[in-house]
Amino acid sequence: MKLTLVQIFFMMLLLLLGLGVGLGLGLQMAAAVLEESDQLLDEFLSSDSQDKAEATKEGLDSQSTETLLVSNKVVPPEDTIVNEDDVGGDRMLRAEVLSQSNKHYLRSDVMDRECNALMAPNLKSKDHPCIPQYVFIHEEPDTVKAVCKSPAVACDLKEGKCHKSPRPFDLTFCKLSKSGQVIPHCNYVTFILEKYILMSCSDMKVQITSKS
């Protein structure tokens, strides 16, 4: 069977049309895939940016909580303590040993170490001056009592007789944010420390020291 030129022409035309339609469909499918990929990428980037923003906000919230605990200043401190080594200075401070029966004994929960909460039971006399500085010792009572069995060392008491802890003790140091405050309007700055202490066993006063 012989094909005429007209038949060959029509066959080639149909073939070209078929290729054109197939190519068009292929391009449409490729464009759809690319568009879907772009949408997925945009969603991923948007989600990633949102996660980073949330993480940043959480970090700022955590930092604010920590700063509030450590500083806790409603009234700006009159004498700012800039270094842990300056806490307490060379003065003998009133101290209290917190036993396990005390709700503030827990060392792991720093929110239980906030000075305004710790100091509240000691501030009963209304219109009396606030206690300027105070130390809470978060150790077993027997551990603290054992310090009194150690050799006596010199300290800033009149008698000059104190006893030194064998290791740094877990302490909460409370400092009045501004002098002149009276009960019940006492506001304290909180410092959580691990320091050696010099202790007078007669009247339970301590001196905080960094020296081993």
From Swiss-Prot:
The N-terminus is blocked. Glycosylated. Pfam families: RnaseA. Its main location: secreted. Gene3D superfamilies: Ribonuclease A-like domain (3.10.130.10). Keywords: Cell adhesion, Fertilization, Glycoprotein, Secreted, Signal. CDD domains: RNase_A (cd00163). GO terms for biological process: defense response to Gram-positive bacterium; heterotypic cell-cell adhesion; positive regulation of cell-cell adhesion; positive regulation of flagellated sperm motility; regulation of fertilization; single fertilization. GO terms for cellular component: extracellular region. One of its GO terms (molecular function) is nucleic acid binding. InterPro entries: RNaseA, RNaseA-like_dom_sf, RNaseA_domain. This is Inactive ribonuclease-like protein 10. It comes from Ovis aries.
